[in-house]
Structure formats: C-alpha cells, structure tokens
Amino acid sequence: SRFLAMLCAESLIACGHPAEAGDLLARCAAAFGSDQRHQQLAALVLSRTGRLEEAVTAAGRLLQRYPDDDETAGIAGGIYKRRWDRDATQTKALAKAHELYRKQWEKGKKINAYLGVNAAATALYLGDAEGARAIAGAVAEAMDKRDGALAAANLKPQDGGLAEYYDRVSRAEALLVSGRTDEAATAYAAAFADYPWLAGSIEGTRAQARRIAATL
C-alpha cells in the first residue's frame, strides 16, 4: 500500500539509505501516483543524495502547494540549510532556512520543537547568538511544560521510534544552543545509544551539533 511504502521510505532515509528510498518512492509513484508525503520524501531524497539544485526546486514546489505545513517547512528549511552547508557563500539560503523554521514555529504557537531548535541554530549561524539562545530557551521550557503535563496524566510524549528520536535530540540541541553543554552531551549520547540503527539521522544530528559547538 502507499502508506506502508511511505513508512519504509522514511525508515530507509533515517537509516542512511536515501538512494534505496528513492527507488522505492519511484515505484510507489508508478503504482499509486504522488501525494503530499511522497513529494516531501522525494525532496528529502534529492537533498540526501547530493542533488541539491533539484532539491531546492522541489522545495519551492512544496512550499507553493503546502505553505502552512510544519513538515514541509522543516524539510524545505533543511534543504536550504544544506545548500549553505555545502557553500558558505549561500547566505541567502541560510536566511531562507531560518525564515521558514521560525515563521512556522511561531505560527504553530511555538509547540514544534524540531522547528524551534532549527530556528535557534540558524539564528546562531546568522550571527544572532542572543536571539538563538532566546529561541532555544523557549523550546526547552515548552518541552518541560509538555512533559510535566503528560507525566501528571501518566502519559509519554512519544511512543518510540523516529518521532521519539527527533524529540530527544531536539531537546539536546536546545540545551546546546542555550550553553548547557554538559546536559546536551548527556542527552545526545543517550539518544544515539538508544537508536543506533538511525545512522542517517544520527549523522545529520552530529554534524549540526558540531557546527553549533564551533559557532558558540
């Protein structure tokens, strides 16, 4: 089914096999056509396989079709940030990434931790250390409040898997940008140890953590 194919493609990307995910997405499109999730993952595959100009074009199409979607903003922001990662002269791409992350985070009442920490990181890269710390602090505070409310109801914020991995490393990144480096290191190490099979996601997380640490 389309649903299972999308889950498998997402897992392949997270485990560090974007080319295989691209093959699966192509077969899925031939069988079922394309939808929003297919287009998002296809753009992510282009970025992860180094086809950045195609990825930027795909990101532009996604933003036109789904302008107020958290996942679209996150993927498109990541593509623009990767363009800057590859070429430090692409400061407009970095500014675009920051704009996407921050605006969508604010539209969502500052609930989405992934968008928030990336807004903080890109603010830091743009030279706004004070703004970055403010955003990161707001993210950490919101996550603490959420977890406190869930604990009171005997619930967990995530139920395992990729979503929980990103939740945990988002907290670690918020701590790092806030200057709480020892706590961040502990949080990163625990997440990496609990999800060692997510090699592709871990590689990206580590790269961003190294860049943040070098910029602080």
Model-based region annotation:
Residues 1-10, 32-44, 48, 67-86, ...:
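Amphipathic alpha-helical repeat scaffolds of TPR domains
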Residues 27-28, 62, 104, 191:
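Canonical positions in the second alpha-helix
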